[in-house]
């Protein structure tokens, strides 16, 4: 769905309209595997949302696979079946969304609970309005087989599933710290 007229010249279109045209052409292809690299780059939020809605409702069916690379993970998080992070050509993270939702937990703690939360060895920590948000991997060596779980973490503060963007920051920060130390 677009507002581009049939008699429009490509050279007269805005960058966003050229992107809309390109995406319409891509979606017209009947392919079992569709690879989209930053498909909504240059589109405003309204057209990005419409594109993903069309992609899922008009294009996708169970016989097709769609691979999307994007820096705007938050706009597609709710439609993903799997997530993968790549750093310098190497896969550094790969899991299903089902595993993601059961495995990763963020806890927002007050300063009084911060030391107890840190003792559980989170994979990442960031400050937030005078409190700390700690991200845990419940399947890590300190997680699934350890002495804490999601319910026990809730005694330390507010517990929720992290966004993919927050997990990305944690994984990449740890990756860069590890590879930087190895050099």
Predicted regions and their residues:
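ABC transporter nucleotide-binding domains
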Residues: 1-87, 93
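Short N-terminal micro-motifs specific to bacterial/archaeal maturation
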Residues: 4, 91, 105, 155-158
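Generic structural signal for secondary-structure transition and capping sites
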Residues: 22, 32, 105, 173-177
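Residue-level marker of positions within ordered structural domains that often coincide
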Residues: 26, 112, 173
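Short, surface-exposed beta-strand/loop "edge" segments at domain boundaries and coil↔beta transitions
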Residues: 34-39, 114-117, 141-146
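ABC transporter nucleotide-binding domain
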Residues: 52-141
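C-terminal coupling/interaction segments
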Residues: 129-183
């Amino acid at each position: 769905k677009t507002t581009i007229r049939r008699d429009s010249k490509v050279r007269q279109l805005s960058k966003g309209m050229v992107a809309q045209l390109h995406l319409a052409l891509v979606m017209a292809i009947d392919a079992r595997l569709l690879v989209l690299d930053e498909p909504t780059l240059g589109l405003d939020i309204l057209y990005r949302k419409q594109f993903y809605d069309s992609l899922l409702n008009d294009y996708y069916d169970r016989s097709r696979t769609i691979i999307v690379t994007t820096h705007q993970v938050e706009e597609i998080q709710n439609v993903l079946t799997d997530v993968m992070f790549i750093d310098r050509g190497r896969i550094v993270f790969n899991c299903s969304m089902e595993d993601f939702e059961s495995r990763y937990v963020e806890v927002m703690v007050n300063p009084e609970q911060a030391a107890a939360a840190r003792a559980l060895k989170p994979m990442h920590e960031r400050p937030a309005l005078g409190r700390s948000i700690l991200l845990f991997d419940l399947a890590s060596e300190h997680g699934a087989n350890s002495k804490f779980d999601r319910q026990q973490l809730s005694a330390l503060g507010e517990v929720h599933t992290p966004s993919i963007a927050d997990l990305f920051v944690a994984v990449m920060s740890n990756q860069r710290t590890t590879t930087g130390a190895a050099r």
